[in-house]
Every structure is written in C-alpha cells, then in structure tokens.
C-alpha cells in the first residue's frame, strides 16, 4: 500500500513538471534539498507565530472575561487616557481674566503641594532605608567581631589543636548547656552574688573559685588558682583609675614579690617531692629545714662531683650550689647559713650577701652593687662554676643577657632568675647588659618569644603562668580564653581580677579581645571584658538564663557607647532570646499584681528593666510580647498602643478557634476587664481607639455569624459611618479624628454595613407586601429608608479624605444599584 502511495505521488509530480514546462514564459527554478527544507521551515515558523499570537489573545480574553472585563474595550480605554492634561504647562491667561487666574493659581498650588509631598516622601524613604542599613550593618559587624576571639593572626589560627568555637552550637531544649566544670564555677558565682546582693561582707571570689578548682581534681587548674591567689594578694594602690594603679612602681614591685614567692614556694614543694620520692638516694636527715632539704636534693641532683666547681665544699657539698638552691627555695637565711660556714673561702662576698638578705627589696646599695659588679666582670664572669656566676648575677643584678641555661634549665627557673634581676630604679650609670626592666621582660616574653616558643598547644597552662607571673594578666586571660577546654577558667580569672579592680578594660565595646590603646606605657594591654563575658554566656543563654543573669550582674556598673547600662542591655537581649519572660521578669497575676522574677534579686528598679526589655521587643517587631511586658511594667499607654496595632489587622477576619485573631481578642478583653475593674486608663485617643476596636470585633463577629440585625445595632450605636444623609457631614468631620488603626478597617466596615443593608433589603422584598399583615405603605417606607442609608454610605465613602483599598467603591455602588 505504501508503494502505491509513493507511485501515485511520483505520477502527480511528473504531471506537474510537464505542465510547468509547457508554460514557456515562466522561468525554471531549481532548488536542492537543503534549500527546500529551509523554505519549508520559514513557512512553518510564520504559521506557528501567527497561531501562537491568536492563541495567546484567546487565552487572555478567556482569563479577563471570567473577571468581567472586555478585552476589546481595554485598549480603547487605555488609548483614551492621557496624563498630559494633568501635568501639562498651564495656559497663559489675560490679565483681566480673574477666573482663569484663580484657576491657574489653584492648580499651581495643588501641583506644588503634590511635588513637595513626593520629594519629602522620597527623602524620608531614603533616610529610613539608610538608617535600617546602618543598624543592620552594625549588627553584622558586632557578630563578626564576636566571632574573632583574638587579634591579628591568632584569630585565623586553624591548626588541628584549635577547637571549634561554641558560638554556633545550640544545646538541646530543656537541658543545660553547662558542663560539670562550668556548673561548678556557676555555683560559686551564685554564692558570691548572693552575698553581694544581700549587703553582707563581700567574699573573695578568688577563694570561691579556688574551692571549686580543688573539687575538680585537676592539678593544673588547682595550681592556676593558687597562682592567681598569690598574685592578687597585693595592697591596692589608691589611684583615679586601674591603669595608674597597675603602672605604679609600688604595685609592680608588689607583683614582682608575689611572683618570686610563688616560684620559690613551688620549687620548694618540688624539691620536697623529689626527696620523698627518692629517700634512699637523698639520705634525708638532720634538723628539718631548707638547708638539710637542699643537701638531700643535691644527692639526687648532683650524684657525682661536677668538674669546674669552685671555692670548696660545705659538709661535702659544693658551696655555690648550696647557696643557689637555698635561694631558689626562697630561704635566704639558709643561704646565709651556708655563706657563714664558708666565709673564709668567699672573701668579701659574705658582707655583700648579708646586706642583700637584710635589704627591704633584695637590693644592694649602689656602692656595694657597683663593687660586686666590678668583681663579677673581672673575676667571676669567666668562672667555670655556673652556680657561682648565677648567684653573683642575681645579687648584683648584672649581665642580664646571660640566661644561665646550665643551671636554669626549666621555664620556671628562667622566670625566677629574670624576675630576680628586674630593677625599677632609673640608673643612669648602668650599662644595658646590667639593666632589665619589667616592661622589657614582658615584651621579650610576649612578643619576642611568643606562643611558638612555649609550645602552647601542649602546655597552655605553662604559657598562661609565664604571662600571669610577669603581670601580663590581660594577655594571659585572652590566650587561655581562645582554647575551648580552658575558656571557663579564663573567664573566672577575669571576673576575679575585675572585682579586685586589677583588670585593665578596653574603653570601647567594639575593640578586639586584647588591644593596645594610644598613650599607654610599654607592655600595657587592655582586655575587652564585656565582650569576653558576653561570648562566654552566649553558649548557655538559651538553656540556662538564670546562670547567664548571674554573670551579667557583674556588668551593672558598665556603660556602652551610648551611656546605657550594660546590665540592662544584656538582660533585655537575654529575655528576648530565651523568651523566659515570666521566669526572668515576673508574671502578672489575675488581680493585676506582679509575681517577682529572677531579676528582682538584683535590683529594686525592675520597672526600668522591664520597660527596656519591652522597648527592645517593640523595636524588633515583637508587639505581642512587648505589650505583655509593658503591662508588667504598669505602662497602660504603651500596652493599649501596641494592642491597637495588633488588633487592627485582624478586626475584620472571620474568627476561628485557636486562631491569631481569637488569641489577640481574648488578650484584649482580659486587659479591658482588668483596666475597668482597677480604674486604669491610658491617653484619651489611645483609650478610645482600643475600645472602638473591641466594639468593631463584636460587630464583625455578629456579621460573620449571620446575625445582621445585631450587627446593624452595633454599628448604629458606634456612629462610625452615617446611616442618614443628615449625618454624612458630621461623620466625615469625625473621621479626621480617628487613628490609622480604625481607618485601615474602613473599607471592610463600609462593605459589611452595605452587605447588611442589602441583606435586609432582600429579606424585605422576599417577604411580600402582605406578609405578617405588613401594610404596603410601611414596606415602601422601609424600602426608602434602606436605600437612603445605602446612599449615605456611598456619599460618605466619596467625601472622606482617605484612599480605600481595592475596588471598595465599585462594590459599594454595585450593591446600592441592586437596591434601586
């Protein structure tokens, strides 16, 4: 069958070709297959385009026609519209044409007012947009700064040992985010604040934290707090601020004494433990004391004679080794005992050492010191006895560039040696190699050596000790805070120093965690204490708001850049984030009284804090929460103002169980009942708007329930819209006094009222003229009244200076027409 079809097609083609050849006046056109295909595609595309356009027009007509629009007339109506008559230049008028002149002046005034309003609107929109962008950018900056826990390259340290910040972590709801160490510290903070708030004698926060550390069964942490306790046991120097106090010579000398005492006591304990661990080798005996302890320790430390030791022995032990280790244990009297026994071998050293022992700050007089330094340079510097050299360098505070690594082979020994050589007097005659100041030593440890030298990932507590013992408290805390496992210890050390007024705080809240400030002496750094505390509490604020509140209490006297209390600010953010309004701020009872919350413990002026939290909630758009908080703070103006904003969008909605409208309605009714029973009232305009909105809710409830007569009675009593031509002017004048919350519902109110009139009209028409014995005349009168009321609504809608939503006017007119 296919063969027959092709054969027939071939026959027709040949016939067509023969007919074409017979017409001699037509030229022959020869095309190959590709040209024929292209021509066919062009014809097909033209046909498809025309068909698709017609199809689109048909679809548009169907769509718009279903909405009652005639597409054939739309283009004609659009072409007939012209904006030229509105904004075209006014025609010139003759000088004697008063009517034309007045018309032009009126039009000019209207156009000027419109243009001015347009410009002002655009300027205000730009300003609001710019302010919003600045606020948002500031929040982003704060979040970025809060994630940078340290300055410089340390903030971008992504080594394997660095642990992930907890800032992004969130604990499981209902569970505490605090681990056992953090909880132990939190209990001590609670106990401390209890004493402070109750007005009792302020306890020592260092003591409380030390007790918590002892229960943790971690020697590193226990030693840390022993060191903190030792270093903070200094008399506070009276000064106008912490910086002057910390930089005073008396305070620095006090820190130095405490650091030396800590290192000496630690070494003595180490010596004692070494001896008791090797009793057989140590051969401990004799009168208990440092001298015999050192002798036993030397049996372990120097089991065999060391070549090069000078000036003989005392009871078989090297003289200078005995002196050094007695000094290292902090017992100068034991060292004096050794010197006295070997005085014939030591020459004038006995007198120098005796003066050193009995001096106030372990400092020789300038004459004796110069004499000792001269002897050191001439005879001792080249000595083969390392113990002799180090003792001379300590007593004479000379040759500070020599680290004496043969003797001081541990970090603690090096620290003790250098701190023993630090001087505070301004010595003009001293050479640089004989002078070491505390700022120089601090710089050497923190900047020259730094973290890499001390292998901080393996021994973080050692580096903290190095910085803390050299009075670099802020740098030590910032370092420890960067490590996840030691962060809580750093925070509580900072709290302890803060309470003792020994902490140097940053002046700006946006500063880095550790910062330098212009004009500060060398070696001084500031800690952003507020940021440190806020970063720490962020982890457990959602799950443990009570504990976070305890920490925020330390900020009660701190101010932000706007002079606002940081305690207020942090509490407000805590309440908003945790949503624990009742637990933190208290709860409003049915009788209007307030049940105290956690905040009541810390301040009597709870109203200020609650108002602040409410203000923050309002600024964040949390109007419902803000209204409840203002109610808690006894601020009826703000309560009703925000309730009006909440009610306005839902007034005309159909009520449903557990809906947003139902919840807000119940809240508003409870407020209204309580305020009426207690005689509470707000500002007159806010008050009237609130109760009018409640009446409108009643109106729409009846309307949606189909109770048109009850709804009509409500709207008639409200006198919000005119129901007669005589009251139109009065209602239009009264409309100007209504708030925006009422105006926004005007379209729905008018439509609902017109629907009620139309429903009554249809019911009247459907009842018949003689139903229930109603006379014809009465029915006509009722008809006339309903039409008059509908006409009054139309007139009112056209006269009010308010642009109603959508096609309100068209729908009103449509229903009014159906009633005629």
From Swiss-Prot:
Q: Where in the cell is it found?
A: Nucleus membrane; Nucleus, Nuclear pore complex
What is the recorded membrane topology of this protein?
Peripheral membrane protein
Answer yes or no on keyword DNA repair: no
Example GO biological process term? mRNA transport
Recorded GO molecular functions are: structural constituent of nuclear pore
Question: What's a Pfam family in this record?
Answer: Nic96
Q: Name one GO cellular component term.
A: nuclear periphery
Q: Does the record's keyword annotation contain Phosphoprotein?
A: yes
Q: Which InterPro entries match?
A: Nucleoporin_int_Nup93/Nic96
- Keyword terms: Membrane, mRNA transport, Nuclear pore complex, Nucleus, Phosphoprotein, Protein transport, Translocation, Transport
Residues spanning the signal sequence: none
PANTHER family named in the record: NUCLEAR PORE COMPLEX PROTEIN NUP93, NUCLEAR PORE COMPLEX PROTEIN NUP93 NUCLEOPORIN NUP93 DEAD EYE PROTEIN
What family name appears in the similarity comment? Belongs to the nucleoporin interacting component (NIC) family.
The entry's function note states: Plays a role in the nuclear pore complex (NPC) assembly and/or maintenance.
Question: What's the protein name?
Answer: Nuclear pore complex protein Nup93
Phylogenetic classification of the source organism = Eukaryota, Metazoa, Chordata, Craniata, Vertebrata
